[in-house]
């Protein structure tokens, strides 16, 4: 797997059908976010001469934690950072964290944000100073909560939960890069355009996304500013509106 990594960089590793594993590196050390599988991660890190020091787990679903046990066999000293409320479902975690706390990785602060909705203990990890000191934009690892053009399904939460979570994320800086865990942008925007064909921001973004996907390029990370303009779920004014949109999206058969 060819991976382009610079010092203090976050790089995507596409796996399975649409998962994105994020590899955040600085110097010779790396942090991996939501590793669905291990083999391509091991290959990529070894290719770049990187040592895994930590795994960030946003939630317990198999396509986010499936590769972690094998990564720990390869790098047994790596920390596994996850919600302390989810010890039963992420039993190999070594550093339980709680919402509202801060820790340091690769020399920069990481804030833990409660975004329970998709699952009951879902966390997001926010890097207010970016992925390394020195002027990088803020970064958000948000798992399956805020997607590019969409939001996660409500498996264990309610529309109120998701609305609260998204409104919390909406207060972050507009320049924040959104590192979500799936490449869902085209489908999300096709649905949004079908629902609101007159919305110019959605239409323009969809055209850009289709052009990228035609070239087999990723559409993420996006920015919070872009999501404010064209993400119907982030724009929802109430939990009731979000719930209506979520049901419409769940029932949509278009893409």
UniProtKB/Swiss-Prot annotation:
<dbReference type="GO" id="GO:0046872">
    <property type="term" value="F:metal ion binding"/>
</dbReference>
<feature type="binding site">
    <location>
        <position position="118"/>
    </location>
    <ligand>
        <name>Zn(2+) 1</name>
    </ligand>
</feature>
<dbReference type="GO" id="GO:0019243">
    <property type="term" value="P:methylglyoxal catabolic process to D-lactate via S-lactoyl-glutathione"/>
</dbReference>
<dbReference type="Pfam" id="PF16123">
    <property type="entry name" value="HAGH_C"/>
</dbReference>
<feature type="binding site">
    <location>
        <position position="61"/>
    </location>
    <ligand>
        <name>Zn(2+) 1</name>
    </ligand>
</feature>
<keyword id="KW-0862">Zinc</keyword>
<dbReference type="InterPro" id="IPR001279">
    <property type="entry name" value="Metallo-B-lactamas"/>
</dbReference>
<protein>
    <recommendedName>
        <fullName>Hydroxyacylglutathione hydrolase</fullName>
        <ecNumber>3.1.2.6</ecNumber>
    </recommendedName>
</protein>
<comment type="subunit">
    <text>Monomer.</text>
</comment>
<keyword id="KW-0378">Hydrolase</keyword>
<feature type="binding site">
    <location>
        <position position="64"/>
    </location>
    <ligand>
        <name>Zn(2+) 2</name>
    </ligand>
</feature>
<dbReference type="GO" id="GO:0004416">
    <property type="term" value="F:hydroxyacylglutathione hydrolase activity"/>
</dbReference>
<comment type="pathway">
    <text>Secondary metabolite metabolism; methylglyoxal degradation; (R)-lactate from methylglyoxal: step 2/2.</text>
</comment>
<dbReference type="InterPro" id="IPR050110">
    <property type="entry name" value="Glyoxalase_II_hydrolase"/>
</dbReference>
<dbReference type="InterPro" id="IPR036866">
    <property type="entry name" value="RibonucZ/Hydroxyglut_hydro"/>
</dbReference>
<feature type="binding site">
    <location>
        <position position="144"/>
    </location>
    <ligand>
        <name>Zn(2+) 2</name>
    </ligand>
</feature>
<feature type="binding site">
    <location>
        <position position="59"/>
    </location>
    <ligand>
        <name>Zn(2+) 1</name>
    </ligand>
</feature>
<comment type="similarity">
    <text>Belongs to the metallo-beta-lactamase superfamily. Glyoxalase II family.</text>
</comment>
<dbReference type="Pfam" id="PF00753">
    <property type="entry name" value="Lactamase_B"/>
</dbReference>
<keyword id="KW-0479">Metal-binding</keyword>
<comment type="function">
    <text>Thiolesterase that catalyzes the hydrolysis of S-D-lactoyl-glutathione to form glutathione and D-lactic acid.</text>
</comment>
<feature type="binding site">
    <location>
        <position position="182"/>
    </location>
    <ligand>
        <name>Zn(2+) 2</name>
    </ligand>
</feature>
<feature type="binding site">
    <location>
        <position position="63"/>
    </location>
    <ligand>
        <name>Zn(2+) 2</name>
    </ligand>
</feature>
<feature type="binding site">
    <location>
        <position position="144"/>
    </location>
    <ligand>
        <name>Zn(2+) 1</name>
    </ligand>
</feature>
<dbReference type="InterPro" id="IPR035680">
    <property type="entry name" value="Clx_II_MBL"/>
</dbReference>
<dbReference type="InterPro" id="IPR017782">
    <property type="entry name" value="Hydroxyacylglutathione_Hdrlase"/>
</dbReference>
<dbReference type="InterPro" id="IPR032282">
    <property type="entry name" value="HAGH_C"/>
</dbReference>
């Amino acid at each position: 797997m060819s991976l382009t990594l610079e010092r203090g960089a976050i790089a995507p590793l596409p796996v399975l059908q649409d998962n994105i594993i994020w590899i955040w590196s600085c110097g010779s050390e790396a942090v991996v976010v939501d590793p669905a599988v291990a083999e391509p991660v091991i290959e990529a890190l070894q290719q770049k001469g990187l040592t895994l020091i930590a795994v960030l787990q946003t939630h317990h679903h198999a396509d986010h934690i499936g590769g972690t046990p094998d990564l720990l066999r390869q790098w047994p000293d790596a920390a596994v950072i996850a919600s302390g409320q989810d010890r039963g479902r992420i039993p190999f975690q070594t550093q339980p964290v709680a919402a509202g706390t801060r820790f340091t990785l690769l020399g920069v602060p990481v804030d833990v944000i409660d975004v329970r909705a998709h699952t009951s203990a879902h966390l997001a990890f926010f890097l207010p100073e970016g992925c390394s000191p020195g002027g990088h934009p803020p970064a958000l690892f948000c798992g399956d909560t805020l997607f590019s053009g969409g939001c996660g399904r409500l498996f264990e939460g309610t529309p109120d939960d998701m609305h609260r979570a998204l409104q919390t994320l909406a207060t972050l800086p507009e320049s924040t890069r959104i590192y979500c865990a799936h490449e869902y942008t085209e489908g999300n925007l096709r649905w949004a355009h079908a629902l609101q064909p007159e919305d110019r921001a959605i239409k323009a973004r969809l055209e850009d996304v289709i052009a990228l996907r035609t070239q087999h390029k990723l559409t993420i990370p996006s920015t919070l500013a872009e999501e404010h303009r064209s993400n119907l779920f982030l724009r929802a004014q109430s939990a009731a509106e979000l719930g209506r949109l979520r049901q419409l999206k769940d029932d949509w058969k278009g893409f």
